[in-house]
């Protein structure tokens, strides 16, 4: 016999005080503390959202059986109930499920909701995993999710330099899609016409302030002149495009002025652009049949700068990929004072070595010097490791490095260990035997704002 009825959404669920108190700290306080009116009631009405009410019977059953069936559709409302009533073991279960099904959530248009909820509730590990998926796979964010993407969340994403994009124009188009969804929502609001216009103008200028127009080529900037949004907010966009053209034409004094402003601090820092101009996809097929310590060498070129000043030049790169680790054989180190034995070392990780083949030599007397020109090559290197989760192929992890190459320092030692020996989640294709890694190399100038190099994901 139950001694309590919990009413949710007009439906009564028989329950037992002892079971509820043993499973939930919130129910324990509610039902045992005399300061709460519910402690003496035999029927308690709980206010839940419609989605919370739909999963409440399963939530309550978990108190008795310790088992619950969750899916990509129900995990968020179950987690919200577990958070609300402080059912810690169920919270852990839901977060574990979410971390293993992030790609599926993206495919089914639920990732933004997962990301924003976990960010708000302090579930930092899952929130970071969701953010990383969005940053590195923005093409998976469908229009239906854009309506749910909050202003502050979008602004947070736009400030990151490790967004993986085809180019900056891709991000511009993403923001336009988001604004179109916001306009639909605003048109159904109760705001007056003047309030609606003020809010819309503020929204446009705020979000586009974080789009890095200087990273667009002149042809892309010219196309933007014809966009309706540009015509509608002509003063704002003309100013941003003028800054972009100053960068593209090498007007360094003007760039330095803009960089000193709060809104211009990050404008001249490239993101991780995947178009052919900036890198190469390294695909290793038949992974399982490769011998240990196998090496693949790839050669490609990138532009030495994002601006058009040196558009006719190329920087040549050689990438050595070790998909099954490296074997450093025993050797001998001879120095002036003594001789040392260097022991054998075997590293099982996937490793990459990057070499710049045409670093500029020391400047000659005919070189036209500018205080912003540098005789070496400073770049940001992005190593994108692909993976598969629930049948969804995506960028699963990113290694980001900043390095300065020169005639005396042609190789980057920082891009060594990319990931542990590939697990099934890192192997693609119908036979799960392809390792896919994309190398992105974007040039940096003194106007770029970059932090310490770090491994992400």
Language model features with spans:
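Alpha-helical scaffold in the C-terminal half of BTB/POZ domains
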Residues: 13-15, 23, 41, 56, ...
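Cytochrome P450 catalytic domain signature, combining two hallmark sequence patches
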Residues: 25-40
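Alpha-solenoid helical repeat scaffolds
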Residues: 45-47
């Amino acid at each position: 016999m139950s001694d309590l009825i919990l009413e949710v959404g007009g439906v009564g669920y028989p329950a037992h005080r002892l079971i509820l108190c043993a499973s939930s700290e919130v129910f324990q306080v509610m039902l045992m503390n005399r300061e709460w009116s519910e402690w003496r009631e035999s029927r308690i009405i709980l206010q839940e959202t419609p989605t919370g009410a739909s999963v409440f019977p399963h939530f309550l059953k978990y108190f008795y059986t310790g088992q619950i069936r969750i899916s990509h559709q129900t995990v968020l409302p179950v987690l919200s109930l577990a958070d609300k009533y402080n059912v810690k073991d169920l919270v852990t279960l839901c977060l574990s499920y979410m971390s293993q099904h992030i790609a599926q959530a993206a495919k089914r248009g639920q990732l933004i909701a997962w990301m924003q909820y976990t960010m708000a509730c302090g579930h930092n590990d899952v929130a970071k995993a969701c953010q990383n998926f969005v940053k590195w796979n923005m093409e998976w964010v469908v229009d239906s999710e854009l309506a749910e993407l909050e202003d502050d969340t979008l602004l947070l994403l736009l400030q990151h330099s490790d967004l993986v994009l085809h180019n900056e124009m891709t991000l511009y188009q993403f923001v336009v899609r988001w604004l179109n969804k916001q306009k639909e929502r605003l048109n159904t609001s109760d705001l007056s016409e003047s309030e609606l216009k003020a809010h819309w103008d503020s929204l446009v200028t705020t979000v586009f302030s974080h789009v890095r127009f200087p990273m667009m080529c002149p042809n892309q900037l010219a196309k933007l002149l014809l966009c309706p949004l540009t015509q509608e907010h002509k003063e704002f966009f003309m100013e941003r495009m003028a800054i972009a053209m100053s960068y593209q034409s090498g007007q360094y004094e003007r760039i330095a002025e803009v960089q000193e402003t709060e809104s211009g601090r990050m404008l001249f820092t490239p993101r991780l652009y995947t178009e052919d101009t900036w890198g190469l996809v390294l695909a290793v097929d038949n992974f399982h049949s490769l011998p240990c310590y196998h090496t693949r060498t790839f050669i490609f070129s990138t532009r030495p700068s994002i601006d058009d000043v040196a558009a006719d030049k190329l920087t040549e790169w050689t990438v050595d990929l070790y998909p099954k680790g490296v074997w450093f054989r025993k050797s001998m180190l001879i120095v002036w004072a003594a001789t040392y034995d260097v022991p054998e070392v075997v590293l099982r990780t996937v490793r990459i070595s990057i070499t710049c083949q045409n670093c500029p030599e020391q400047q000659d007397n005919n070189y036209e010097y500018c205080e912003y020109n540098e005789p070496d090559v400073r770049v940001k290197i992005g190593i994108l490791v692909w993976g598969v989760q629930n049948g969804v192929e995506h960028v699963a992890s990113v290694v980001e490095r900043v390095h300065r190459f020169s005639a005396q320092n042609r190789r980057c030692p920082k891009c060594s260990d990319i990931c542990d020996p590939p697990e099934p989640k890192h192997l693609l294709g119908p036979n799960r035997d392809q390792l896919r890694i994309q190398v992105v190399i974007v040039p940096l100038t003194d106007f770029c704002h970059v932090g310490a190099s770090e491994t992400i994901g």
